[in-house]
């Protein structure tokens, strides 16, 4: 993918629950649920692909169904998906509960896997080749500082 845009960073599962009425703390609340791939790097890669750019995505994922869901969504958009898979970990996720007007009630960001995406991971052969094969790199600033500076 010579001259592609390389996007490096977060690609995870976003979950949003939206309540049908006012929040009743400490009780079950009726509402709707939406689950889809997201994350800063994933969303940027999707938008670049929609604009017609050749895009390669490198992001840490777990060896689970959620990681496969992110990969499948990227591939549907024509993104060259190159996940760094941690087989013994879960793919990161963000879960938000929203009031009926869209305001956030509470959220859970399960993003610990991103902290394991160290500069050493960038030295893997396939990642090095991807970095060498591109002129433009977009990097998610939520990655560890040592990874970004590498």
Regions found by a protein language model. Give the residues of each.
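Glycine-rich phosphate/adenosyl-contacting loop at the front of the ribokinase-like
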Residues: 1-60, 65-75, 106-107, 145
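Short, basic and Ser/Thr-rich N-terminal targeting/leader segments
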Residues: 51, 77, 89-92
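Ribokinase/PfkB-type carbohydrate-kinase core domain
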Residues: 1-11, 56, 73-86, 98-150
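Residue-level "edge-of-site" marker
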Residues: 61, 86-87
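C-terminal catalytic lobe of FAD-dependent flavoproteins
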Residues: 95
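Generic intrinsically disordered, low-complexity segments enriched for polar/acidic and small residues
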Residues: 39, 91, 111-114
